[in-house]
């Protein structure tokens, strides 16, 4: 293992680009300008960019406090355009006779302004929506107004869900009910007959092809959703017996939310193509093939099959889907179906950037120790001698010695043979040894396994104005990696190594895994914190799933969110969605602000009567309490 090598020459923005890998995960939307600030180009390579640091400062001048979620509508539009353009090129290249009609899975980001923008941007492509629950179906019915767009109805379904989806046909929706559980078949038949409306029905297949990584269990015989091949055949016969086989028009599969290897996609397409052909042979009126999600996001910029990356481009993906289904249909002499993908992660991730500030830093002491004297305890003299002797020839042995002496010092203290000042002296010497050893280790091409954790042990803790549980729950829950970096000072060398600790009173409220080249780093390169000066960090590619899955741990609520649109003169704020106030989050757990305030007022009156508080103090307390109820749940800068 090689530790981060510290440069001794003058630092440049090119060094920062390489260190934070922004050209890998950020293209074509994010870069670094000559001022050392992160820039965002919401329209990709079509021109126009904003200085992210200057944008954040301008928003703060408008009383929009950090932490802050920036949503760039132009990026959302660009993602839809790119996805449709990739499929259009693939269709033209392979002479595919069907069309492509994408849908956005609402579960990826249910925010109203996001869905409104997606529907608007997708109109020219007949881009539709996918619902995975009854509430999401209600959103889709109301928001989707694009003629010819598809409404894919997934998830668990009761009679009410099925009735709503079928009745939506009367509003002109092309609503397709995807059968995912065996019992849904009879329910759809019964509801259809009761309403006198023939639905469009699909089946979700449990492919034997499985993805890799943490989403690999989305497919396979024991997947949560879908029908096995025998269950699909049973569904076909049930529909045939009811005289409704003509309603079966779609095959759907899903092999995972983030597929890192293109080979997995190819295998799934091959298997699905054969199932589709067999359904045609059995007499179903097949028209659509829904390849589900899986189009990945390159979170670490490595372009590999690492779980935080993908070894293919969007064009590779589209071409393999089109070519695979084209081959399957040509073999059987059947028409090419309309292709559907549910590429929510690939569409929504890039448009959101989470900005937060550093509140303070806890560092390992960086001191040159005073020489040990003959009067000091032997363990202290041993630690100092170890420190003095450290060089590039013995740094591994010295580290093991320092660990041993530190352990002995703690044992001596616990048995009463060392005083508290002596223990403090021993610990300071131990950290001085570690700092000296780490300085040598960073210059080596190879570092022994014994020293792999040294970088993390010596890392500073940067306290951030954020709740990991609220804003990046996947970082905590499934160890997902997101690109994180400073948005300014990138013309300076980041000489510190740190982890990020959030505001919650929970030891899990931290981020201590960071992107690396096809690997995971335990520390992030950061700049020295300057008290009194703002230090802003950005977390990128977090537009899918994070907002809705966040929770209220310690009652930290939603952050402020600003929708930004590029204009010829700069930018405009399309929407400002204020984050939760303390009164709002207290309401979520059944506390009423007025009732709480009244309780405090009664207590202050009682304290006044007992002369425990002055009138001025009571007034100050009440004003502060009332102001706090109306305030943001996060710390003010």
UniProtKB/Swiss-Prot annotation:
Positions bound to substrate: 289-299
InterPro entries attached to this UniProt entry: Ala_racemase/Decarboxylase_C, Arg_decarb_HB, Arg_decarbox_C, Arg_decrbxlase, De-COase2_CS, De-COase2_N, De-COase2_pyr-phos_BS, Orn/DAP/Arg_de-COase
Q: Which reaction does it catalyse?
A: L-arginine + H(+) = agmatine + CO2
For this UniProt record, give its keywords in alphabetical order, as a comma-separated list: Decarboxylase, Lyase, Magnesium, Metal-binding, Polyamine biosynthesis, Pyridoxal phosphate, Spermidine biosynthesis
Give residue numbers for the modification (N6-(pyridoxal phosphate)lysine).
107
Tell me its cofactors: Mg(2+); pyridoxal 5'-phosphate
GO process annotations (BP): arginine catabolic process; spermidine biosynthetic process
Give the family this protein belongs to, as stated in its UniProt record: Belongs to the Orn/Lys/Arg decarboxylase class-II family. SpeA subfamily.
The free-text function statement in the UniProt record for this protein reads:
Catalyzes the biosynthesis of agmatine from arginine.
Q: What is this protein called?
A: Biosynthetic arginine decarboxylase
Organism source for this protein? Answer: Thermosynechococcus vestitus (strain NIES-2133 / IAM M-273 / BP-1)
């Amino acid at each position: 293992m090689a530790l981060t090598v510290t440069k001794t020459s003058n630092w440049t923005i090119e060094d920062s680009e390489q260190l934070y890998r922004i050209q890998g995960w950020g293209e074509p939307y994010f870069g670094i300008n000559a001022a050392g600030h992160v820039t965002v180009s919401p329209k990709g390579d079509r021109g126009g960019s904003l200085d992210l640091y200057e944008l954040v400062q301008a928003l703060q001048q408008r009383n929009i406090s950090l932490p802050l979620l920036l949503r760039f509508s132009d990026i959302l539009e660009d993602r839809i355009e790119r996805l449709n353009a990739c499929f259009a090129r693939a269709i033209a290249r392979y002479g595919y006779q069907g069309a492509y009609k994408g849908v956005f899975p609402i579960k990826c980001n249910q925010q109203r302004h996001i869905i409104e923008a997606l529907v608007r941007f997708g109109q020219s492509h007949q881009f539709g929506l996918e619902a995975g629950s009854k509430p999401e179906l209600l959103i889709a019915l109301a928001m989707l107004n694009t003629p010819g767009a598809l409404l894919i109805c997934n998830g668990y379904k009761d009679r009410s869900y099925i009735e709503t989806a079928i009745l939506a046909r009367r509003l002109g929706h092309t609503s397709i009910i995807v059968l995912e559980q065996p019992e849904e078949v009879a329910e759809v038949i019964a509801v259809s007959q009761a309403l006198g409306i023939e639905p469009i029905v699909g089946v979700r297949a449990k492919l034997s092809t499985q993805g890799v990584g943490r989403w690999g269990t989305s497919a396979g015989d024991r997947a949560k959703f879908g029908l096995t091949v025998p269950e699909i055949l049973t569904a076909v016969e049930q529909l045939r017996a009811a005289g409704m086989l003509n309603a079966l028009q779609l095959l759907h599969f899903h092999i995972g939310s983030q597929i890192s290897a293109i080979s997995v996609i190819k295998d799934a397409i091959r298997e699905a193509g054969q199932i589709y052909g067999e359904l045609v042979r059995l007499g179903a009126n097949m028209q659509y093939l829904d390849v589900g999600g899986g189009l990945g996001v390159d979170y670490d910029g490595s372009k590999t099959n690492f779980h935080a990356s993908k070894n293919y481009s969007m064009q590779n993906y589209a071409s393999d889907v089109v070519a695979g289904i084209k081959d399957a249909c040509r073999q059987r002499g059947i028409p090419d179906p309309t292709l559907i993908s549910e590429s929510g992660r690939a569409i929504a991730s890039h448009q959101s950037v989470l900005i937060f500030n550093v509140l303070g830093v806890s560092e390992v002491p960086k001191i040159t120790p005073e020489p040990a004297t003959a009067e000091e305890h032997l363990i202290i003299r041993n630690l100092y001698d170890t420190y003095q002797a450290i060089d590039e020839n013995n740094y591994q042995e010295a580290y093991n010695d320092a660990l041993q002496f530190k352990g002995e010092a703690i044992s001596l203290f616990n048995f009463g043979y060392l005083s508290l000042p002596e223990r403090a002296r021993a610990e300071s010497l131990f950290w001085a040894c570690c700092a000296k050893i780490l300085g040598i280790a960073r210059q080596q091409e190879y570092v022994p396994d014994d020293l792999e954790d040294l970088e993390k042990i010596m890392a500073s803790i940067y306290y951030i104005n954020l709740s990991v549980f609220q804003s990046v729950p996947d970082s905590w829950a499934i160890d997902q990696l997101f690109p994180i970096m400073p948005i300014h000072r990138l013309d300076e060398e980041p000489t510190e190594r740190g982890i990020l600790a959030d505001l919650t009173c929970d030891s899990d409220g931290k981020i201590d895994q960071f992107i690396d080249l096809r690997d995971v780093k335990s520390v992030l390169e950061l700049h020295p914190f300057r008290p009194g000066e703002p230090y802003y960090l950005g977390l990128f590619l977090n537009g899918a799933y994070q907002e809705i899955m966040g929770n209220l741990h310690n009652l930290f609520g939603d952050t402020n969110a600003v929708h930004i649109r590029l204009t010829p003169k700069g930018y405009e704020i399309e929407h400002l969605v204020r984050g939760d106030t303390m009164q709002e989050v207290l309401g979520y757990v059944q506390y009423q602000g007025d009732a709480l305030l009244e309780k405090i007022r009664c207590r202050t009156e009682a304290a006044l009567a007992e002369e425990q508080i002055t009138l001025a103090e009571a007034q100050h307390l009440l004003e502060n309490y009332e102001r706090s109820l109306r305030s943001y749940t996060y710390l003010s800068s």
